[in-house]
Amino acid sequence: HRLHVGCLLVKNNRIISQGYNGHLPGCKHESIVRNNHEQSTVHAEQNAICDCAKRGVSCEGATAYVTHYPCIICCRLLLASGIKQIKYLEDYKNDDLVKYFCGQLNVQLIKL
């Protein structure tokens, strides 16, 4: 059972990007599990940031709306891209490091 996750990046009240978790573009849709984690998928937050990068759109100052609490890797990418708020709907394997790094960078982490 795969979790379905979506992410919107919003800046100045406009959606600048969207992403959902899915297989790596151009690769076969096959499950490759290593260390109990799927290796062939890209997370929703990663896809949204990559979409901005491909189109030359800055994420600086944007808000991320995510269906689920972000993993630590996605959190680091969101923070490094300049996201200033992360809002999520559902708790999912909440990692305390996400709160820690958000706090270090004064990024609001808000459960909706």
Regions from the language model: what does each represent?
Residues 1-112:
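Zinc-dependent deaminase catalytic domain
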